[in-house]
Curated annotation (Swiss-Prot):
Record Pfam families: dsrm, Ribonucleas_3_3
Cofactor(s) of this protein: Mg(2+)
Protein name: Ribonuclease 3
InterPro entries in the cross-refs: dsRBD_dom, RNase_III, RNase_III_dom, RNase_III_sf
GO terms assigned for molecular function: double-stranded RNA binding; metal ion binding; ribonuclease III activity; rRNA binding
Bias-annotated ranges (Polar residues): 220-231
Subunit structure as annotated in this protein's UniProt entry: Homodimer.
Similarity comment: family membership: Belongs to the ribonuclease III family.
Role according to the record: Digests double-stranded RNA. Involved in the processing of primary rRNA transcript to yield the immediate precursors to the large and small rRNAs (23S and 16S). Processes some mRNAs, and tRNAs when they are encoded in the rRNA operon. Processes pre-crRNA and tracrRNA of type II CRISPR loci if present in the organism.
Database matches in HAMAP family: RNase_III
Domain RNase III per the UniProt entry, residue ranges: 6-135
Lineage of the organism: Bacteria, Bacillati, Bacillota, Bacilli, Lactobacillales
Catalytic activity: Endonucleolytic cleavage to 5'-phosphomonoester
Region (Disordered): 209-231
Length: 231
């Protein structure tokens, strides 16, 4: 199982562990260790502790650098959405981690690999193990592959109102006329999609799509704000 995991990590993420035992530890639950006491195995809780701290740090640093004018309160809410149990469990599933977790027989029968709490732990423990094995840069590369693209995909749009955030940013030094214009709508009434552009003083600064005008406006505002922050 760990051999297959190592092969997957190499193929998908270019990650090769120097210490295979550390990788195995990150994917081993206590129930498995208890059933294999003759093998002197370790389980994931200690590296999970480290991974939790590493993830909060790298996500905090990324948000601080990317959103240079975002207030602390909004940064905190966005970070909380990115480093929560639900998000980490989702990332673990997208990485196909569940099938590689070593569980005791009882936990296997209970389908423990489906629990968000366990998948969150495994995601954190993997990052902790990667940090111990190779340091900060490989961790940054991994989260740039797995976590940060979700910002541009709109995964965390529900955390705050991008239209308000964009307005506050554009008008911080004075009045700016902000307008949202419908470019195109497509599809039948029950499946209609909308393309909307956002303009600042008549100049297009972003565009977005959605299944409602409100969703498309939020998408356009998010794209515009992200692009402005990167200038």
């Amino acid at each position: 199982m760990i051999t297959e995991l190592a092969a997957m990590l190499k193929e998908r993420f270019g990650i090769v562990f120097n210490d295979p035992d550390l990788l195995a530890e990150a994917f081993t639950q206590a129930s498995y260790v208890n059933e294999h006491q003759d093998q002197q195995l370790k389980y994931y809780e200690r590296v999970e502790f480290l991974g939790d701290a590493v993830l909060e740090l790298v996500v905090s640093e990324y948000l601080y650098k990317r959103y240079k004018d975002m207030p602390q309160g909004k940064l905190t809410r966005l970070r909380a959405a990115m480093v929560c149990e639900e998000s980490f469990a989702s990332f673990a599933r997208e990485c196909d981690f569940p099938q590689y977790i070593r569980l005791g027989k009882g936990e296997q029968k209970a389908h423990a690999w489906e629990r968000d709490s366990l998948l969150c732990d495994i995601f954190e423990s993997f990052v902790g193990a990667l940090y111990l094995d190779q340091g900060r840069e490989p961790v940054l590369k991994f989260v740039h592959q797995v976590i940060f693209p979700k910002l541009d995909e709109g995964r965390f749009d529900g955390v705050f109102d991008y239209k308000t955030t964009l307005q506050e940013y554009l008008q911080r030094d004075g009045d700016v006329a902000i307008d949202y214009q419908l470019i195109e709508q497509d599809g039948p009434a029950n499946e209609r999609s909308y393309e909307i552009a956002v303009l600042a003083d008549g100049q297009k600064i972003g565009e977005g799509w959605g299944h409602s005008k409100k969703e498309a406006e939020q998408s356009a505002a998010r794209q515009a704000y992200s692009q402005l922050q990167q200038k």
